[in-house]
């Protein structure tokens, strides 16, 4: 245990060493500055990476064990991923998984930092740095609209239907470009009110602001909202990726090999 004076002295020494102010101090409390919050995030990543490293070396003589860190977006393909994990764990019950949810850019960033072993990414996405397996699952695009909207009565919606209507789009640039291509000449008439990376909060915003979310069909129910497919149909593929240059734990290497066999059996 450290006494308060000792801790305060060490914090001041850390500020001097880094050449930045980490805390705003008052008589009764201290508050992290932006530099302080950055240092905290980096420290959390270091701790997470240290824990992952210990997990990588955890094994028994006779049985595969350890923890595999996997990232996935909000995708229909996530169901395929959970089935893959469950099948692998039936053969390797001592292996556990740590699941991280985010969009493709978030997941790639964490793979680059060594915090994730494998990621399930939505295309289009740059995978030049990665080995990959393309899954047989296709993601289908549409809009989440208010159940009271005129669009909710349609079997599908066209670019003309969405021109001028308040829209919420995914915030990934590659995906936005794909959607703008789908809108064609109507792209100039779009009224984009918000962007975001995960659907849960965007669905609430759509319901409260009478906007439409352009999204993948996740087969999820949101009160007061209905999913309507796009026409012409728009689909996205998904890929399971891992770094080309990374040395993996025995558990992660076995899971990658298992994934290749599992997916080849689905094709």
Where are these regions (language model features)?
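Helix-turn-helix DNA-binding motif, specifically the short coil turn and the N-cap/start of the second
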Residues: 2-6, 10
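A short LG(V/I)-centered, amphipathic sequence patch enriched
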Residues: 15-32
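Alpha-helical linker/hinge and terminal dimerization helices associated
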Residues: 17-18, 39-61
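Flexible hinge/capping segments at coil-to-helix
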Residues: 61, 130-141, 145-167, 250-253
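Central regulatory/effector-binding core of bacterial HTH transcription factors
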Residues: 65-126, 195-198
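A late-sequence structural motif
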Residues: 80, 228-267
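Secondary-structure junction motif
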Residues: 122, 165-187, 248-256, 266
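Beta-alpha-beta core module
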Residues: 128-134, 138-140, 197-247
């Amino acid at each position: 245990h450290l006494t308060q004076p000792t801790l305060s002295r060490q914090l001041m020494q850390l500020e001097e060493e880094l050449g930045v102010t980490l805390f705003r101090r008052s008589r009764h409390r201290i508050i992290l500055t932006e530099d302080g919050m950055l240092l905290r995030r980096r420290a959390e990543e270091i701790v997470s990476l240290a824990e992952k490293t210990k997990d990588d070396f955890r094994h028994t003589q006779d049985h595969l064990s350890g923890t595999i860190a996997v990232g996935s977006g909000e995708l229909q393909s996530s169901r395929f991923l959970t089935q893959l994990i469950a099948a692998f764990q039936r053969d390797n019950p001592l292996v556990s998984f740590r699941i991280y949810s985010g969009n493709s850019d978030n997941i790639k960033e964490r793979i680059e930092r060594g915090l994730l072993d494998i990621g399930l990414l939505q295309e289009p996405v740059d995978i030049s740095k990665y080995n990959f397996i393309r899954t047989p699952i296709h993601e289908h695009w549409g809009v989440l609209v208010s159940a009271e909207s005129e669009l909710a009565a349609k079997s599908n919606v066209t670019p003309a239907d969405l021109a001028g209507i308040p829209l919420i789009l995914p915030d990934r640039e590659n995906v936005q470009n794909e959607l703008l291509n789908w809108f064609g000449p109507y792209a100039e008439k779009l009224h984009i009110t918000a962007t975001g990376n995960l659907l849960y909060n965007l669905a609430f915003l759509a319901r409260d602001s009478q906007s439409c979310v352009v999204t993948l069909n996740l087969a999820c129910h949101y009160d007061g909202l209905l999913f309507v497919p796009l026409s012409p149909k728009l689909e996205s593929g998904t890929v399971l990726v891992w770094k080309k240059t990374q040395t993996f734990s025995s558990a992660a290497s076995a899971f990658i090999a298992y994934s290749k066999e599992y997916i080849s059996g689905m094709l």
